[in-house]
Amino acid sequence: YSESEEIYLKIVDYIFEQLDNDLAYTKKVYKYMLKGDIINGTQICKLLLEQDIIDIDEEEEQRFLNGSITAYAFMMNRIQNLDITPAQLALDPHSASMVITDVNTGDVLALVSYPGYDNNKMANGVDAEYFNSLLNDQSTPMINYATRQMTAPGSTFKMVSATAGLMEGIITPRSTLFCNGLFDKITPPASCLGRHGSLNVTEAINHSCNMFFYEVGYELGTEGESYSSELGLEKIRNYADLYGLTETTGIEIEESAPTVSTEDAVRSAIGQGTNNFSTVGLARYVTTIANNGTCYNLTLVDKITDRSGIVLTDNHASVRNTINMDSSYWDAIQQGMRKVIESKSYYNDLGVKVAGKTGTAEENKNRGNHALFVCYAPYEQPEIAVATRIAYGYTSTYAARMTKEVLKYYFDLAEEDEVITGTASQIT
């Protein structure tokens, strides 16, 4: 048998071996050292310089070293100039995704996930050291956030509920419901962010009135005098299915399967409950709205060629289903989305009319809300649809502003260097 001291030493060796590979523990050590004034911010900044983690001009480096720039200002400059990226910080928010589709064909024009990695180091033999660094990266760059990350859709889901309400005869384009800020037909009551008074479905989408859609969710589950959440959920699922939100989108790479809510029809009608969708799933959904009801199985593949470039197969997205809905219903929903954008002053100078819907979704009370935005443009004759998500991005305004920059570039309203400036647009 081993002696107790020998066992103790082996346990200690094992613990130290594990701690050497525990990035979370290492971060806690640094945090303890900073809070205990064992090291200070200036020393941390000097480490970044000495280890060549950042590259800055000599003038700023000298100003920092001689004390003309504080450590705080130095770090803010690094973040502002993207010398240190959100992915490197791995603080919220550090990831985002965007999907752009051709609304008339179902082709995926762009599918972007941040952070990413260098494909060149993963081809023709994997760089083992680089691959290991990706596996241990706290920003998880190997996850395709556009296809694999699932979050609640927030208020971007309200067009599904609007469709359900209209097609089930609960509401008409002109009928109104009254919002007093509290829906008390269920226990516990559900609240609205405002007291909107009487509004129709177009105004409810514009103002993102929870109360309006709570009532729709409740009525979907009501037969006679009896309310059944299960019945309401079944109907919500049926209309979510019309927009392709019950299954994967058809793209030729792996994606996570969506979830349509299975609890609380009233709250599910505003995008809460257990609703969970990918960014590419939301892109297919808004594509279907933009083209008045054609739901495509999306595709990433344009054509297949042989080695010499001869086309073997021309590929086209297939139509999954169509939504046969009265044109006045489409008008009511789309006008609501247009009014959403008209209320955003930062879209006034874009030069192309856009229809869209913002959404925020809480997943963790200790972290920021997910920021979501879906849209299509031009409003009168749609060409593209866009879905954007910034995980733990706090406010949907950030997702909407980021999308605006992409729209400017797509519609030739700005040059690439005007959109990609190499600096952060805002630090808060």
Predicted regions span which residues?
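Short, gly/Ser/Thr-rich active-site loops of penicillin-recognizing serine hydrolases
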Residues: 311-312, 316-318, 404-428
